[in-house]
């Protein structure tokens, strides 16, 4: 028996043992292995599908985030614009009220000045009238014959009043 050329009996028994092992493996081992490979394949496919769905949801969340950011930005712009409009309106209202109040105060001040002026003019007229009467009375007391004396008397009386 040579190592390189086996005998027919050995070959027969090797083929028979290989056939029995193959038959047992095919009947009991391969279905389990195939089942495990199929389960693993199904698990991998399921995981891939879940990953795709997760990516899809993540994209949806990112799109929602971008939409919310844009919406928030637009609302912020609107609120800022509205606040500026309110600020301008408040400033304009305050200016308008200040102008109205200023005009009212100026009108009242002018009226008061006019009244004071009229009262002062009336007082001056009364004083002039009283002075005129006083001067006339003093002039009449003196002799009316000399004009030069009358003028000196009037000048003297004016100096006394000052």
Swiss-Prot record:
GO cellular component: plasma membrane; proton-transporting ATP synthase complex
CDD domains from the UniProt entry: ATP-synt_Fo_b
Compartments, as annotated in UniProt: Cell inner membrane
Matches recorded under SUPFAM superfamilies: F1F0 ATP synthase subunit B, membrane domain (SSF81573)
Entry-linked InterPro entries: ATP_synth_B-like_membr_sf (IPR028987), ATP_synth_b/b'su_bac/chlpt (IPR002146), ATP_synth_F0_bsu_bac (IPR005864), ATP_synthase_B_chain (IPR050059)
Domain of life where this protein originates: Bacteria
Gene Ontology terms for molecular function: proton-transporting ATP synthase activity, rotational mechanism; proton-transporting ATPase activity, rotational mechanism
Main localization, broad class: membrane
Sequence similarity: Belongs to the ATPase B chain family.
Cited function: F(1)F(0) ATP synthase produces ATP from ADP in the presence of a proton or sodium gradient. F-type ATPases consist of two structural domains, F(1) containing the extramembraneous catalytic core and F(0) containing the membrane proton channel, linked together by a central stalk and a peripheral stalk. During catalysis, ATP synthesis in the catalytic domain of F(1) is coupled via a rotary mechanism of the central stalk subunits to proton translocation.
Listed name of the protein: ATP synthase subunit b
Gene source species: Azobacteroides pseudotrichonymphae genomovar. CFP2
Gene that this polypeptide is encoded by: atpF
